[in-house]
């Protein structure tokens, strides 16, 4: 009986700390307002994250998308809902359709539009205009397709 209880608690602990697989519809739980940033004399879209996104902040998530190799020499990659030809940077979709990748290993190399599933800690960014609104920290490749 004691053995059964121990096994139950181990399984419960594993499930409670497990990563959550999400899709892009979850990240769409955000609204934007124009915010003037004096430092750069421009208006930016300021995010107001919805409850389902705020619930994921600081948690490990898994998401599949197209890797955009923005600057591979600097290990700077973006995960996008769509390929480069139809991504946020080309005027299709909003900022909620991209996630900045802070890779755990600088040895990861991707090619443009490579489809990959990435695992990392989701950070919500509303203050730094030089980074994306969604950032995956300690990101690792979960699956390459």
Positions of predicted regions on the chain:
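Sec-dependent N-terminal signal peptides
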Residues: 4-14
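OB-fold and OB-like single-stranded nucleic-acid-recognition modules
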Residues: 18-145
């Amino acid at each position: 009986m004691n053995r059964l209880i121990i096994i139950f608690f181990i399984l419960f602990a594993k499930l409670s700390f497990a990563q959550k697989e999400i899709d892009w519809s979850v990240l769409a739980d955000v609204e934007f307002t124009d915010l003037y940033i004096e430092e750069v004399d421009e208006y930016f879209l300021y995010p107001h994250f919805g409850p389902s996104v705020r619930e994921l902040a600081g948690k490990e998530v898994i998401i599949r998308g197209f890797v955009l190799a923005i600057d591979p020499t600097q290990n700077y990659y973006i995960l996008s809902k769509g390929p480069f030809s139809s991504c946020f940077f080309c005027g299709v979709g909003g900022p909620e359709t991209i996630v900045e990748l802070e890779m755990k290993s600088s040895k990861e190399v991707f090619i443009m539009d490579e489809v990959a599933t990435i695992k990392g800690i989701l950070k919500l960014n509303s203050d730094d205009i030089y980074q994306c609104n969604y950032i995956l920290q300690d990101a690792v490749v979960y699956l390459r397709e």
